[in-house]
């Protein structure tokens, strides 16, 4: 899809790069010549990912809790020492659990907000201040949720991801003079390693209501992410990749 050397001499950080969409994004960046760092909380999944990604190019892994600024600072130190620069940041790390809004505990709410919103911001701020401001260039792509029509059962994550999307619009203007672009990718239901975390009946119901009658793939999300990462005149946008689902019908049953 892209020229094989498109990302030669580019350094990329993918959070949540050990599995699913993040893994595929890392793989495609490697395929097109980038030096890639992947980061995640789970060491064993990172180790497996490094083995699987090795045939595609040079990848380095770092155990990272995006909720902890000290951990992020150590990662930035490693990238600065080993590579001296960072060109592209992919904020893919996140997590949530299905629950009726009224049943979410204070701790449950804070855990999702701290990961999906605060963690995304902590990583973005550190990498921008450490690298992008110094270089007067940089590309940030956030992987968010397709919550265009709301996301019943995921109110905590819907709130956090909406915050990330508005943050992207704000930073796109605030940092435009520094040569930084900031965009979001909002996938619909994707056939990935996280799909089994949702009730099977919910998954089947949603699949039947997608105009294209299928789930998206990690490869398709990665292709869009790479496109936004290399685009120079697109910033502040949230691009939906959901098979047309947001323009057709309703996914959610009202009880």
PLM feature spans:
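Substrate-binding pocket helix/loop in short-chain dehydrogenase/reductase
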Residues: 100-101, 105-113, 195, 206
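Conserved glycine-rich cofactor-binding loop
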Residues: 18-20
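Catalytic loop of short-chain dehydrogenase/reductase
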Residues: 141-163, 168-177
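Active-site loop of short-chain dehydrogenase/reductase
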Residues: 10, 58, 85-86, 100, ...
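Conserved NAD(P)H cofactor-binding loop of Rossmann-fold oxidoreductase domains
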Residues: 92-97, 244
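Conserved Rossmann-fold SDR core element
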Residues: 29, 85, 165-168, 172-191, ...
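C-terminal substrate-recognition "lid" of short-chain dehydrogenase/reductases
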Residues: 214-241, 246-247
């Amino acid at each position: 899809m892209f020229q094989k050397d498109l990302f030669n001499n580019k350094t990329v950080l993918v959070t949540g790069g050990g599995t699913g969409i993040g893994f595929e994004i890392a793989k495609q960046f490697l395929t097109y010549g980038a030096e890639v760092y992947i980061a995640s909380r789970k060491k064993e999944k990172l180790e497996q990912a490094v083995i699987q990604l090795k045939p595609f190019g040079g990848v380095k892994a770092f155990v990272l809790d995006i909720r902890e600024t000290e951990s992020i600072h150590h990662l930035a130190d490693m990238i600065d020492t080993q590579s001296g620069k960072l060109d592209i940041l992919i904020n893919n790390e996140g997590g949530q659990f299905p629950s009726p809004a009224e049943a979410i505990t204070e701790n449950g709410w804070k855990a999702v907000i701290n990961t999906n919103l605060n963690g995304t911001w902590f990583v973005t701020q550190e990498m921008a201040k450490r690298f992008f401001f110094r270089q007067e260039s940089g590309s940030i792509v956030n992987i968010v949720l397709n919550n265009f029509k709301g996301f019943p059962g995921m109110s905590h994550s819907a709130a956090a991801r909406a915050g990330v999307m508005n943050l992207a619009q704000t930073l796109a203007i605030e940092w435009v003079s520094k040569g930084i672009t900031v965009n979001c990718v909002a996938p619909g239901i994707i056939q990935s390693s996280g799909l089994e975390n949702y009730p099977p009946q919910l998954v089947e119901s949603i699949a039947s209501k997608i105009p294209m009658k299928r789930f998206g793939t990690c490869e398709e999300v990665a292709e869009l992410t790479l496109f936004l990462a290399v685009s120079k005149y697109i910033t502040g946008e949230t691009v939906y990749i959901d098979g047309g689902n947001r323009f057709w019908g309703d996914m959610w049953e009202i009880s």
